[in-house]
């Protein structure tokens, strides 16, 4: 991952140094040394700060001329078997990708699962969460324009993204590389445990 992604950012609230310490250990495990901490924008409600934080990183990456950017949230944790999945999936990613999700959650009520674009890549049609995803540099300007058009609509950033999937090349790595660690969510204000891999397998299996 270190060599594939041009820029890597981790969104972290100033009041959560514990999470920054924890995610650094995760990245060290993956031999990622160039990740940069991005101080999360604190707002009330918290999801607004999340929205603005992601937008700010997109704008910074575009301004820096990034070839691509990987954005992580500070509760992203690697699956123990992430490496074989990454080694396989990176060979299957075409050069014309727009977004790649390294972790995601699917609608459990979905009647139409995301199709496989390759053995280790799903062509996403409906996925949520923003704890681990990447954006191709060529798509940054269009994505920024689209996200800015959603300001004031009271729609969380992950939903804003997902509504664009039908028009772009958005892929999900399968099996996933990152999950969102169970624990207290500063955005939702409660303890969460999304059981990501179980969720994705459930949706894929029930629709086969």
Residue ranges and their predicted role:
Residues 1-72, 76-208:
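An acidic/histidine-cluster motif and surrounding catalytic segment
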């Amino acid at each position: 991952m270190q060599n594939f992604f041009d820029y890597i950012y981790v969104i972290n609230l100033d009041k959560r140094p514990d999470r920054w310490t924890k995610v650094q250990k995760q990245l060290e495990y993956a031999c990622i040394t160039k990740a940069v901490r991005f101080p999360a924008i604190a707002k009330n409600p918290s999801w607004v700060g999340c929205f603005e934080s992601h937008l700010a990183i997109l704008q910074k990456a575009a301004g820096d001329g990034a070839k691509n950017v990987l954005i992580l949230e500070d509760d992203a944790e690697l699956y123990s078997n992430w490496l074989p999945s990454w080694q396989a999936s990176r060979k299957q990613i075409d050069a014309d990708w727009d977004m790649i999700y390294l972790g995601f959650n699917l609608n459990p009520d979905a009647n139409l699962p995301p199709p496989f674009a390759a053995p280790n890549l799903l062509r996403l049609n409906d996925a949520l969460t923003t704890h681990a995803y990447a954006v191709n540099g060529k798509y940054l300007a269009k994505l920024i324009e689209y996200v800015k058009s959603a300001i004031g609509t009271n729609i969380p950033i992950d939903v804003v993204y997902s509504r664009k999937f039908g028009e772009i090349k958005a892929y999900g790595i399968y099996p996933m590389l990152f999950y969102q660690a169970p624990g207290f969510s500063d955005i939702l204000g409660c303890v969460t445990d999304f059981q990501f891999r179980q969720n994705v397998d459930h949706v894929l299996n029930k629709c086969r």
